[in-house]
Regions:
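Active-site and glycan-interaction determinants of carbohydrate-active enzymes
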Residues: 183, 248-288
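Glycine- and acidic/polar-rich repeat regions and solenoidal domains
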Residues: 1-250
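Generic hydrophobic/packing signal
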Residues: 2-4, 36-37, 44, 267-271, ...
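Short, surface-exposed, low-complexity cationic segments
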Residues: 288-306
């Protein structure tokens, strides 16, 4: 999803084996061939990704801003967080100016650079999958060769946004006239945009954003997860729902997510009506208190996906 992905919604999908599924030798060929489940590039949002199953080593390439992830099951890493949005000039800054639009339209409203951030993570489940040696070799290569497009992170979780501000921290920079009442420096117009995270679960060493106050990190259990193709379709195989027992998360809605910063557009339906995330992957109704991830319960997770 590149450039003008404003208003895009990716929902109810199964992604797997999208990052070089077979063993390989880390090198230039692998660098140019490695993939991920979803790639969102230099867009200003809003881009909504909800109720998906992302099982590849690399879940989301997020060289962009204005993305909301809601009720997903994620086993791969976020890559290109904070990088991948310049034109690549060798000696001077070269940020790309990309278009944003009028709300729910195709008319260009303006052009702006990417500050990164302005992302939301609500009610997701992060499960660290075993890291294949070949993927670790590639991550070591790409993470240490000065690559400013893709560092090939293979650790899952929201921790890649460590150092990004909360909304309150970001907003405080603008106190007084043009921020002159703030204790911070004059970087407020160029620093990263804020991040929101709540209701997320982390397993197998998946790592939470440092400022997520209600993250649940399970260090007791080991979650197994895979997909199986049977004669009649694809099924999820996991013990995850033997471990998740409580329904502690609230229902997320358009109002929870707010507006994407640059286009000032909400995460809503194409007709402008609000979205209430009160149904799971299969359309099962969620109670007032619900569970993170794409399914309401173990029974739902055992249904045929496709």
């Amino acid at each position: 999803l590149g450039w003008q992905a404003q208003g895009t919604r990716v929902t109810g999908n199964l992604f797997h084996d999208n990052a070089l599924p077979n063993d390989f030798e880390a090198g230039d060929d692998a660098v140019t061939s490695v993939g991920e489940d979803i790639f969102v590039e230099v867009s200003h949002g809003p881009t909504l990704i909800d109720h998906n199953i992302l099982l590849s080593d690399r879940a989301l390439k997020i060289a962009t801003q204005g993305v909301a992830l809601v009720h997903n099951l994620i086993c791969g890493g976020f890559v290109s967080v904070g990088i991948g949005t310049d034109n690549g000039a060798p000696d001077i800054p070269s940020p790309r100016y990309t278009p944003y639009h009028t709300k729910h339209g195709t008319q260009v409203a303006g052009f702006m650079t990417i500050l990164h951030g302005d992302d939301r993570f609500y009610n997701n489940i992060f499960v660290q999958k075993p890291i294949r040696p070949c993927m670790q070799d590639l991550a070591d290569l790409m993470g240490n060769n000065g690559n400013m497009w893709d560092e090939c992170n293979v650790i899952t979780g929201t921790f890649k946004f460590n150092g990004y501000p909360t909304f309150d921290e970001w907003n405080k920079q603008f106190e007084g006239y043009c921020g002159m009442g703030s204790e911070t420096t004059g970087n407020c117009y160029y620093d990263h945009l804020p991040v929101w995270a709540s209701g997320n679960l982390y397993f197998n060493g998946a790592r939470a954003w440092e400022k997520e106050t209600d993250a649940v990190t399970d260090t007791e259990h080991t979650v197994d997860i895979s997909v199986e193709e049977k004669e009649d379709g694809w099924y999820l195989k996991t013990n995850l729902y033997d471990i998740i027992k409580e329904e502690n998360d609230g229902i997320i809605s358009t109002e929870t997510l707010g507006m994407a910063f640059e286009p000032e557009q909400k995460y809503e339906n194409p007709d402008g009506s609000p979205i209430i995330f009160n149904q799971d992957f299969f359309g099962n109704h969620r109670d007032v208190k619900t569970v993170a991830g794409p399914f309401t319960d173990k029974k739902a997770s055992e249904q045929k996906l496709f």
